[in-house]
Amino acid sequence: MNKKTKKLTLILIVVLVILAFFLTPKLLDSLPKHFSISSDANFYIVGYHNIEGYKLDDSEFKKVSDEKVDIVKGQINPTVKRAELSNRYLVFSEEGKPHGVIGRVTAIDFKVGEIKHHKTDDYAYTSSGSNPDYYFTSASNYIATFDSTLKKLDKYIFEKPAILSDFSNEGNHLYFLGSDAKTDSNRQNPNYLYHFSFHDNKLQLENKESLFEQPEVTYYFNNSLVRGNYLYATSSGYHKDSTKEKVILGQIFHYNMDSGTKEFIDLPEIAPSNLYELKGDLVAIEHSTVYSKKIGFSLFHLTNHSSQFIDLSEFGFDVNKDSLKDVKQIDDDTLLVLVGNKILNYQISTNTVLSQKEVDPHSFHIWVK
């Protein structure tokens, strides 16, 4: 081998080493990860770097499994909805580091114990939604659709940039709220109800209507859900158009989409935001700690519109640091509440926390089998 050949060989080896250094992590990152499913677990707590299995034993938390597995590399926006699909998959978006860099969509399969990632520009940057089988992501100018395998099925581009709110629908007709990203001629951002159909893996805009109009004020609307022909959305108040003065309230907006009837239902606490669907007609509603100065949630019945506020401030949470992360219902009288670095066992009938346990501070979701 002459000197020239040796030099070329050395250069080739160096190039291959450099390529391996940069490509191997990306290749490994795209491969599915696996974790063990425990037959003893009644529910799992999902964190950035682990999945813990638990059951309740005489109302006390008993850990039955703890698997270390890297799930989140960047960060999750806690205000963006996570989807549970087909009673099997937890699907959510994460943002890359630093904030705003290309993110990815993740699916955790709780039937076979598999975690898949899909790197994409079309992750849920500002909001997301779901129906029983599909996950919808949105930024300021689009809504995209993913199935449980993380295959992107379609992407709709809005004519005008729009900021959407998180939503939950039952079937293939999607209803969600949004406002134009830019102000109109009156320097306002009116709220709209969007109606999309989703058939043959295609998103189609069917209708866009003004959600609620009242002279001289503009209302704030947050997350929404649809049951039958009824739309429910959290509303944290309004601002006066002339002065921009904010009036903070606590209400649920109720819209009968058949009759056109619209009403506001008062809640026991101000500044509602995220919705957590529980069993039957029960919904947990998170409230902004900035305005309420409390950590807790409202339990709201969709049928009779009754509600009560569950104040968790007495359990040592810091209203400036801690936040509500998830609420799940495991039977008619029991809620699991993930807040800060604790999981709480809450009994509905007695308005009592029966037990609590510290968990990993990066825990973000409860999966109930």
Question: Where do the language-model regions lie?
Answer:
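N-terminal Sec-pathway targeting helices
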Residues: 1-19
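An edge-strand/N-cap motif at the start of beta-rich repeat modules
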Residues: 23-73
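Repeated scaffold domains used in trafficking and secretory/extracellular systems
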Residues: 28-35, 71-87, 120-132, 160-171, ...
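Residue position within the beta-strands of beta-propeller blades
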Residues: 45, 91-93, 136-137, 176-178, ...
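Structural motif
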Residues: 48-55, 98-107, 141-145, 182-196, ...
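A short beta-strand motif characteristic of beta-propeller blades
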Residues: 62-75, 111-120, 151-158, 202-215, ...
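Intrinsically disordered, low-complexity segments enriched in Gly and acidic/Ser/Thr residues
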Residues: 244-253, 257-340
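Blade-level signature of beta-propeller repeat domains, shared across WD40, Kelch, NHL, RCC1
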Residues: 338-369
